[in-house]
Each structure stands twice: as C-alpha cells, then as structure tokens.
C-alpha cells in the first residue's frame, strides 16, 4: 500500500542515548533545534510514541522557523494517555492511533478536537499507510522514542534517517533505537555529514538502502 516519505530524526549522546536514566533529554543545541523545526515545517505529520508523549510532554509545533504546523500523531496501542498533555491542549490537529481506548477518555479527547483512529493492529506501516489514505500525508517525521523508532526500522518503513551527535556521555538511559535488534544489523547509506554551527555537534543524514 502507498505510504508517505518517512524521515526519522533524533539527537543522541556519544554513547547512543536519547535520554539519561533520570529522563534528562535536552541534548540539542539551539542550531539543532532550529534544524529539527525546519524539518517539521516541511512535513505533513510528526509522529511520536505514547511514552515520549507522556515523559517529554512535547508540543510538536513549528516555533523556531517560519512554516505551518504538521498534524501531530501519537501511537498508543493501549490508549492510556493523559488528556492534559500539551499535544491535546494546543493547536493544531492531533491524531491518536490506538487499538482500544476507555470511553470517557475518548469523549474527553474528542471534545478537544482530537481525532481517534482505531486499528485492529498497531504497526509502523499501518499507521503511516492510514495517514496517507485518510489525511493525505505525503511526508512524515518520526521523532521518537526509541521503541517507536525501532518499529519503523524493523518494518523497513522509513526512507531517511537524520541523527545529531551531541558531545555528551550519559552512561545509561533510553537508547536511540530500542528493540530486540537484528542478527546482523541494517546498513544505511550516508549521504551527507556536517559539523553543526555550534562547533560541537555532528549532523548525519542517511537514506534507507532498498536492496
């Protein structure tokens, strides 16, 4: 089935973490944040998993550059989400993909203008395919967390991966890509690399090789 062009973007520590064991995740310099917001402004939808929505409580809006806000998408198979999250409290449209959701919560979210989409099974591909057909999403950005990123990588459901390396060692915490892993790894093609304007970070762009 057709799907959007999918970009994965994350900023990680030198040792491959997106957050510390205490949840600290402010790894991006101002230039990297602006770069992320520029990508947000160029896509139709930005996707996060339920854990990222709960822990980071992001707005996922475009604020540091000129541009329109994308549709915000939360993937939550259980539908267990706090209705006071920023994603449900500020415009624009937020869509929740779920298998089930408690009736009272669903009514409360719908009253806030949130769209609830039930799928029989939640997979990375099923979500972006539905975004393509239901909301005409042609370009989508996946921002995390690690398990959500892994689901897109495992299903080979992405086209581009952008990663910024921050000059920080965390030692433990949340991995950038978190899952059962591959036996032999998945190889991508490096298409560009650059030193960040801050002089301390490296930004890498890979494309998914279709063998």
Positions of predicted regions on the chain:
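Enzymes that bind and transform nitrogen-containing heteroaromatic metabolites
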Residues: 1-211
């Amino acid at each position: 089935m057709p799907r959007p062009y999918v970009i994965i973007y994350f900023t990680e520590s030198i040792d491959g973490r997106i957050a510390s064991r205490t949840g600290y995740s402010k790894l991006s310099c101002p230039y990297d944040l602006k770069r992320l917001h520029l990508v947000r402004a160029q896509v139709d939808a930005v996707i996060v998993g339920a854990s990222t929505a709960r822990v980071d409580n992001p707005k996922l809006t475009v604020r540091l550059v000129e541009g329109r806000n994308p549709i915000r998408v939360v993937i939550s198979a259980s539908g267990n989400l706090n209705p006071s999250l920023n994603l449900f409290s500020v415009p624009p449209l937020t869509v929740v993909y779920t298998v089930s959701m408690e009736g009272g919560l669903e009514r409360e979210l719908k009253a806030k203008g949130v769209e609830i989409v039930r799928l029989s099974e939640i997979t990375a591909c099923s979500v972006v395919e539905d975004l393509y057909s239901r909301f005409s999403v042609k370009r989508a950005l996946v921002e995390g967390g690690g398990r959500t990123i892994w689901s897109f990588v495992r299903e080979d459901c992405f086209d581009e991966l952008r990663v910024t390396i921050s000059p920080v060692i965390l030692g433990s915490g949340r991995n950038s890509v978190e899952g059962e892993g591959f036996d032999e790894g998945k190889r991508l093609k490096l298409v560009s690399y650059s030193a960040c304007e801050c002089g301390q970070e490296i930004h890498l762009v890979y494309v998914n090789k279709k063998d």
